[in-house]
Amino acid sequence: MFRTMMKSKIHRATVTEANLKYVGSITIDEELLEVADILPNEKVQVVNNNNGARLETYVIPGKRGERTVCLNGAAARLVQVGDEVIIIAYGIFTDEAARTYEPKVIFVDEGNNPVKIAHEEIHGQQS
């Protein structure tokens, strides 16, 4: 049996751009991708905390250090600059691996700077 599990996420990132004219995807600062162990072209789910929208897309790396989080193409219709989003990457694990895998949860500040890395989520935890 295989299980689809949260592999990593960037928690409460701030949308810095929304580019309707781009062909698609989400652009994320290359450094944030490395910290979260998310690869270019990897499928992610984006959850908008401001309006509840959920979407799936793929990642393209943004310029290192600029802290860009930009929704491109049709996804740009689902966000506003300044919205708070959660970016989640999933992995497919064997049953055995799923029981021992520790995901990466990257907490960022309002400027999309990583401030904390956790390997679990606790109910009621705010950040």
Swiss-Prot record:
Keywords in alphabetical order: Autocatalytic cleavage, Cytoplasm, Decarboxylase, Lyase, Pantothenate biosynthesis, Pyruvate, Schiff base, Zymogen
GO biological process: alanine biosynthetic process; pantothenate biosynthetic process
Active site per database record: 25 (schiff-base intermediate with substrate), 58 (proton donor)
Pathway it works in: Cofactor biosynthesis; (R)-pantothenate biosynthesis; beta-alanine from L-aspartate: step 1/1
Molecular-function GO terms, alphabetical: aspartate 1-decarboxylase activity
Assigned GO CC terms: cytosol
Residues with the Pyruvic acid (Ser) modification: 25
Catalytic activity: L-aspartate + H(+) = beta-alanine + CO2
SUPFAM superfamilies: ADC-like
Known cofactor(s): pyruvate
Broad class of the protein's primary localization: cytoplasm
Post-translational modification: Is synthesized initially as an inactive proenzyme, which is activated by self-cleavage at a specific serine bond to produce a beta-subunit with a hydroxyl group at its C-terminus and an alpha-subunit with a pyruvoyl group at its N-terminus.
Cell location: Cytoplasm
EC number: 4.1.1.11
Residues binding substrate: 57, 73-75
Cofactor note: Binds 1 pyruvoyl group covalently per subunit.
Superkingdom of the organism of origin: Bacteria
Cross-referenced Pfam families: Asp_decarbox
Subunit structure: Heterooctamer of four alpha and four beta subunits.
Family: Belongs to the PanD family.
Name of the featured protein: Aspartate 1-decarboxylase
Organism: Desulfitobacterium hafniense (strain Y51)
